[in-house]
Amino acid sequence: MTKRILMLEDGNYFIGDAIGSEKETIGEVVFNTGMTGYQETITDPSYYGQIITFTYPLVGNYGVNRDDFESINPAVKGVVVREAAEYPSNWRNQITLNEFLKEKGIPGIAGIDTRKLTKLIRKEGTLKGILSAATADKEELLHHLRSVRLPVDQVHEVSSAKAFASPGDGKRVVLVDYGVKSSILRELNKRNCYVTVVPYNTTAEEILAMHPDGVMLSNGPGDPKDVPEALEMIRGIQGKLPLFGICLGHQLFALANGADTFKLKFGHRGANHPVKELATGRVDFTAQNHGYAVEKESLIGTDLKVTHIELNDETVEGLAHKEYQAYTVQYHPEANPGPSDVNYLFDEFMEMMNVKEEGELHA
């Protein structure tokens, strides 16, 4: 089997077996701790520009099917696994992981010590990495890798170019696409919403002209400070319409209200992150995928209050506006992959829109 190298910007490297596409690629190397859900993870637009390391030792054992994609065209730069299953077993399986990666033009590497790599990332933080042929000159690879700047316009790359509708007979929702997962749209469709998905740079005036019952801010990749267009829109919407944000939408909501965000050392990426609701003490296990978080101290003096925290590191996981019907969460209530413990948040959004219909927009 052809050999491939994963070189990190700190000089560490791993040599293993090539899987997927043969092309060379550079991205931010991160790790995901989920035991299942590799297909949804690879197709999640929030992973734009990243090389995903799966910590579970066997990936691909139930294959890949056409129904569980979170986006049609995956935006990941590469995939790292300990072992890629060659003979998947599942009645829904259509192609192997290796075949899928080749079809989508995603290079990968298998047969390396993913535990060692994960511990390195936990210690040093996320690092730039390059996947290339094992025969490449290591010094040249390292020099090239260190000279490359990772892109900062991720949302622009994954957002819809123009608005489109997903019809329903119920509430009219505008879903702002910062890299939305298909599962979020499906959750709204399940509740019979008429959803209009709009590009990331849609203005408040354009949204209000659609006369929706509520607005959702989607997940997405990268640093929220790279999306300044969103902040003025959020300020123009909150207080006029019910607002619900997820992941990147949560961070943008915080920035729009005067708080700050920061980059986590190695991020939260997995399906088993415990989150506590402060009002009730309820603890749920959540699906998460983010490299940035809201700075708790920066919320002092703003109109926002913390509603949820992450129990592993006590980072902010939920916010609500003190005056308006607007709330956000850092985690993924739509799951896929992961537990559906917090799926009820979509129902709370529906209730919020009912309150708006009765003319009571303040919290």
Curated annotation (Swiss-Prot):
A GO MF term: ATP binding
Pfam families in alphabetical order: CPSase_sm_chain, GATase
Keywords, sorted A to Z: Amino-acid biosynthesis, Arginine biosynthesis, ATP-binding, Glutamine amidotransferase, Ligase, Nucleotide-binding, Pyrimidine biosynthesis
Limits of the Glutamine amidotransferase type-1 domain: 172-359
One Gene Ontology biological process: 'de novo' UMP biosynthetic process
EC number(s) given by UniProt: 6.3.5.5
Pathway it works in: Amino-acid biosynthesis; L-arginine biosynthesis; carbamoyl phosphate from bicarbonate: step 1/1; Pyrimidine metabolism; UMP biosynthesis via de novo pathway; (S)-dihydroorotate from bicarbonate: step 1/3
EC class (word): ligase
PROSITE patterns: GATASE_TYPE_1
Binding site for L-glutamine: S46, G220, G222, L248, Q251, N289, G291, Y292
UniProt catalytic activity: hydrogencarbonate + L-glutamine + 2 ATP + H2O = carbamoyl phosphate + L-glutamate + 2 ADP + phosphate + 2 H(+)
Location of the region described as CPSase in the Swiss-Prot/TrEMBL record: 1-168, 1-172
Active site: C247, H332, E334
Subunit structure, interactors included: Composed of two chains; the small (or glutamine) chain promotes the hydrolysis of glutamine to ammonia, which is used by the large (or ammonia) chain to synthesize carbamoyl phosphate. Tetramer of heterodimers (alpha,beta)4.
HAMAP family, alphabetized: CPSase_S_chain
Function: Small subunit of the glutamine-dependent carbamoyl phosphate synthetase (CPSase). CPSase catalyzes the formation of carbamoyl phosphate from the ammonia moiety of glutamine, carbonate, and phosphate donated by ATP, constituting the first step of 2 biosynthetic pathways, one leading to arginine and/or urea and the other to pyrimidine nucleotides. The small subunit (glutamine amidotransferase) binds and cleaves glutamine to supply the large subunit with the substrate ammonia.
Family designation: Belongs to the CarA family.
Name of the protein in question: Carbamoyl phosphate synthase small chain
Organism: Listeria innocua serovar 6a (strain ATCC BAA-680 / CLIP 11262)
